[in-house]
């Protein structure tokens, strides 16, 4: 049905917990890379229900929500509506938000982000903080200072913050228009794509991605071959090209030998 496969998710969760003492789950949503899929509120209800049932075994479960692209997915409040649902999870399921400050504030090269713990008790939150302090120091020492200085200055200046928010909204709207153009054109061309909601990339199922990618290169079209498909970056091409590209890809996939 081209929606989140809750049944398979439940099977994987329960199967892994049967074989091991703890489980870490990473969900990249909204605006998943490389498909552009976003879990709906109904999807989140299923995730919470599955994890609540699975937690009955008493083992530790960590749900990591990789929300790096959340502020480029669409309306910022709308795409955060799933957050209260994480409060419904039982005590032995810890939720962690992986948030990218460098992406949200268009500072990609500075590589700055945050892990935000959503715990049911203060003891769990304190333990999470202690573990992160030690593991972070041992892995990369301190976070990028330049990014921290820039962000502190942005939040210390309301006018600058408003400018940054406006700039991000401009690029978010541009990205949404490109994604809409590509998906509409894909439908018109009969090009099958993985369900797309928002984001920087669109994925196309393909039996021989390397061959199709090589064929497209002959026409000056460069896309990334994946294990089972092709990845198109709608973030890197114009809206006009997003409308033209699906038909070109479809034609390449239908050539003899592909």
Question: Can you annotate each of these PLM segments?
Answer:
Residues 1-258:
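PLP-dependent class I/II
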């Amino acid at each position: 049905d081209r929606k989140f496969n809750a049944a398979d998710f439940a099977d994987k969760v329960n199967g892994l917990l049967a074989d091991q003492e703890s489980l870490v789950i990473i969900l990249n949503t909204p605006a998943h890379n490389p498909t552009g899929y976003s879990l709906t509120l109904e999807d989140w209800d299923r995730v919470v229900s599955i994890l609540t049932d699975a937690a009955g075994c008493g083992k530790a479960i960590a749900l990591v929500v990789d929300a790096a692209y959340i502020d480029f997915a669409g309306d910022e409040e709308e795409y955060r509506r799933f957050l209260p649902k994480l409060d419904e999870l039982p005590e032995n399921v810890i939720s962690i938000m992986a948030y990218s400050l460098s992406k949200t504030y268009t500072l990609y090269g500075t590589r700055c982000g945050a892990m935000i713990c959503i715990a049911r008790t203060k003891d769990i939150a304190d333990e999470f903080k202690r573990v992160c302090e030690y593991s972070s120091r041992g892995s990369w020492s301190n976070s990028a200072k330049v990014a921290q200085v820039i962000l502190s200055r942005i939040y210390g200046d309301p006018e600058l913050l408003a400018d940054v928010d406006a700039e991000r909204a401009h690029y978010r709207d541009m990205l949404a228009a490109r994604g809409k153009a590509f998906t509409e054109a894909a439908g018109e061309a009969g090009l099958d794509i993985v369900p797309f909601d928002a984001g920087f990339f669109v994925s196309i199922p393909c039996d021989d991605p390397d061959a199709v990618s090589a064929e497209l290169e002959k026409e000056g079209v460069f896309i990334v071959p994946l294990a089972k498909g092709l990845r198109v970056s709608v973030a890197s091409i114009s809206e006009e090209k997003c409308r033209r590209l699906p038909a070109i890809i479809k034609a390449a996939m239908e050539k003899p030998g592909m």
